[in-house]
UniProtKB/Swiss-Prot annotation:
Residues 1-28 form the signal peptide. The lineage of its organism: Bacteria, Pseudomonadati, Spirochaetota, Spirochaetia, Spirochaetales. Keywords: Signal. The keyword Signal applies. This is Uncharacterized protein TP_0376.
Length: 301
């Protein structure tokens, strides 16, 4: 029995999600790093300056053409203008910059990001109004050197390891680098799963969940909610998840199926029951059971 005509199932699950049964906001799906065209032979690091189109502060007084020329000897310099600058940017540039602002979680302007030649960010900070000279800028850059060395060492460690040790090294790197949830690091997560196929490191659950969410989000962008639910269902059936992860995977399966309005109430409820069975003593179980009861009552099942 399908319920395309009845949105109550999706509404109930959405209400439960808003009150704590679903996880928080996801990370972005699109990786805008490609606009930087990082080359395998490039030895310079990247310096990105995020600004507004009418910037009058440090990005103008400090980042003069002369300073930019000097910086460019050591860094690939990229000035990223705020995406709402309709008067100065083409539609393509606005979209590119919107992705960059999202990727680097810019929370104020001007904003400075430093990253290695491999594209790994090790410094990200709003430039405060007190920064007033080139000397102070160089001091700020030097202050990031310890973080830079940690990121470079963690990246190098990955290539020196195998099997479970490689997975552990990848995890250590992701705990060191800025923006670890970026799509640019999905390949590393897949590498960790392949290297440690027996899950000696115990990291499979976290990485599989991350990658499944990424797949589901892509399907959601395509408005294919059934396929998104299937991605979560495949995840829920993995033997490598913890009890809480398995419960969440089954809940997200039910939630996404319900939103699709193409899956029967019985199947949605079956997924919710599996969520309960996966971790029966969890705090959210009472709420999930209440949702099941309401769904069955509304459908007269």
């Amino acid at each position: 029995m399908f319920f395309r005509e009845d949105k109550s199932v999706a509404f109930r699950l959405r209400s439960a999600a808003l009150s704590g049964c679903a996880t928080g906001q996801s990370d972005a799906v699109t990786d805008p790093l490609s606009v930087l065209e990082v080359s395998q032979t490039e030895t310079r690091e990247a310096l990105m300056l995020f600004v507004s189109y009418n910037e009058t502060g440090a990005s103008v007084t400090i980042f003069t053409p002369e300073l930019v020329a000097r910086l460019s000897k050591s860094y690939r310099f990229l000035r990223v203008e705020a995406p709402h600058s309709a008067y100065t940017l083409s539609p393509e540039a606005r979209e590119r910059n919107r992705l960059l602002f999202s990727e680097y979680e810019v929370d104020g302007l001007p904003f400075l990001v430093l990253q290695s030649a491999q594209g790994d960010a090790y410094f990200a900070q709003r430039i405060h109004s007190t920064l007033s000279s080139e000397q102070e800028l160089w001091a700020l850059i030097r202050s990031a050197d310890a973080s830079r060395k940690k990121v470079l060492a963690a990246r190098d460690r990955i290539a020196q390891t195998e099997a479970a040790e490689k997975a552990i090294a990848i995890d250590a790197f992701l705990k060191t680098v800025r923006y670890p949830r970026s799509a640019r690091y999905d390949a590393l997560r897949k590498e960790a799963l392949q290297a440690d196929h027996e899950n000696v490191s115990g990291l499979h659950g976290d990485y599989m969940f991350h990658l499944a969410r990424r797949r589901a989000e892509k399907f959601i962008k395509q408005e294919n909610l059934v396929a998104a639910g299937n991605a979560y269902k495949d995840l829920a059936q993995s033997p490598f998840l913890s009890a809480s992860q398995k419960q969440e995977a089954w809940y997200l399966t039910a939630y996404t199926y319900a939103l699709s309005e193409k899956v029967s109430t019985e199947d949605v409820v079956a997924c919710l029951r599996k969520a309960v069975a996966a971790h029966p003593h969890a705090a959210r179980v009472a709420q999930i059971k209440q949702t099941i009861k309401k769904l069955l009552t509304e459908r007269g099942i």
